[in-house]
Amino acid sequence: MIEISEKRLIGPIIRLHPNDNIVVARVDVGIGEVVPSENFTSRSQVPAGYKIAAKKITKGEPILKYNVTVGFANTDIEAGTMVHSHNTEFREFDRDYAYASEYKPTDLLPESERATFQGYVRANGKVGTRNFIGILSTVNCSATVVNKIAEWFTPERLKDFPNIDGVVAFSHGIGCGMEMSGEPMQLLRRTMAGYAQHPNLAAALIIGLGCERNQLKGLMEQEALQENSTLHTFIMQETGGTRKTIEAGIEAVKALLPEANKAKRQTVSASHLCVGLQCGGSDGFSSITANPALGAAIDILSRHGGAGILSETPEIYGVEHTLTRRAASKAIGEKLIQRIRWWKDEYSVGRDVQINGQVSPGNQIGGLANIFEKSLGSSMKGGTGPLMEVYRYAEPVTAKGFVFMDTPGFDPVSATGQIAGGANLIAFTTGRGSMFGSKPAPCIKLATNTPMYERLTEDMDINCGEILDGTVSVQEMGQRIFELFLRTASGEASKSELLGLGDYEFVPWQIGVMS
């Protein structure tokens, strides 16, 4: 398990673990600057968030951050020298998975002591944090229709229905030209069904063209969906075309509004919270501030009986052994490694993607040398508790505590899978500055550093840069984030909601051949 210090940060550099051969610059460090706490003089101009060799690192020696290997020196590196992609080699190394060897069950709070929020209790017992009506397209050919229906329901037309958060379209770019059987179609249908049945939707329409490969009948049968008072379907070729389907859809939603508006928030346990964990535009401070603080919040949520979904499989690669050791069983740990091997040995072979080493330009500018270092920070969002289950993309999440879902690293695709799996809240950390938002699950964004937070304050919900500023500890920030979970779940608007984001972020994983 990666150990996170509970001390507040002070001084120009940060030592993350006694065994590390690097430290991290908390502020810009100039050439010739003496660092008394580490007994070296800086040989480089080192930007804040970048690594500095704390002692001589010989060629081929592992570079240790949090006592975890994040690369290898490709040359001799003298103490005080900046350590980054120019002198760090990315290569494979043996990792001991030690399945379930560090498993410790979560110390659950008694139900009477658990936190609460104000949520929408659905007929099936699930709890929503928002109250939307959703309109889904089976295929891109019906995308315009579902969007036109949703656009008709302006705030003015919904003013008599104050308990409804809106009518939202979930259109996408696939549904035809793809394999009719196998994983690609199963995955798309699983994603659509997860949205259609999401607790943040009071009701849903599903609209198809009629001749697409993702046939409406096949979708309904595969996912055991049935038309009822809160789920209606239309086929454009049978309804009379574009205009008539839009009109029929509008009338169908109008009929759903009165019942949907009857939904009232009521006090429910925090155990009904399921938080999808995301990071984007990561930087050198992600593993020091926002990610471990979010992890601390998930540890708290887990004690209250809730769930946190870590995802983005390429962004745990290289540190997956720190998760398998915490798995509740060997079988759960092996599920995680099976997904890693699929990515490495089948899906990404020979491709210029980040699981093969190269991170994005923004990550590199932010101080991250390679995918191992990025993964180190990314994995921290899940906290320090046991890994309770591993899910395929968009599978329904039923386990409580810290779980993992196999998704790509691209944020909209990953969050779509999490929401389809049941996430009713998204928590998103960023160092460079992400503008992501989602529906029907609200998204809160956590800044890793104060300068970015102040520059993008309209988009950021909480400033984890205060950890770096030395005013709060990781654990204290984790408690703040947990409290923000509860307020947001109870209806407090996130920054992304205030900006109207989330209408274009439904992006199912397009995994197969397109022809």
Where are these regions (language model features)?
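Metallocofactor- and cofactor-centric catalytic cores in central/energy metabolism, strongly enriched
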Residues: 2-425, 434, 440-515
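Short secondary-structure boundary segments
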Residues: 430
